[in-house]
Amino acid sequence: MSNVPTELKYTASHEWVLNEGDGVYCVGITEHAQELLGDMVFMDLPEVGATFSAGEDCAVAESVKAASDIYAPISGEIVAVNDDLEASPELVNSAPYTDGWLFKIKATDDSEVNELLDAAAYQAAIDEEDE
């Protein structure tokens, strides 16, 4: 059973979102997603300063099994990326909710976060997938 921290918000496409304050949100992929993908070999992250709309593909996770698009959970501008993943993409596997974060985005509209799934709704969605 995947770990689904309650303090985070989630997307149906397995991204997590952490409110860091001042309209900045940290984004990564969930433990469930990294379990499905397997061992990460490369992370293609967005450029700092790039802007994305919610649901737009903005990064790629390459694992031993597949390359998978990562989607912007909310609209905004990329303000930071996790440079540690260049040398150590496996952090996405070993610490998906901490050291394996992908990027930080400054929201265009904070209210979009309210449309994301809470932990219970995300857990229900992955339970349904597993059936």
From Swiss-Prot:
The modification N6-lipoyllysine is found at residue 65. Its cofactor is (R)-lipoate. CDD domains: GCS_H. The keyword Transport does not apply. Keywords: Lipoyl. GO terms for cellular component: cytosol; glycine cleavage complex. Binds 1 lipoyl cofactor covalently. PROSITE patterns: BIOTINYL_LIPOYL, LIPOYL. GO terms for biological process: glycine decarboxylation via glycine cleavage system. The glycine cleavage system is composed of four proteins: P, T, L and H. Belongs to the GcvH family. The glycine cleavage system catalyzes the degradation of glycine. The H protein shuttles the methylamine group of glycine from the P protein to the T protein. This is Glycine cleavage system H protein. It comes from Sodalis glossinidius (strain morsitans). The lineage of its organism: Bacteria, Pseudomonadati, Pseudomonadota, Gammaproteobacteria, Enterobacterales. The gene is gcvH.
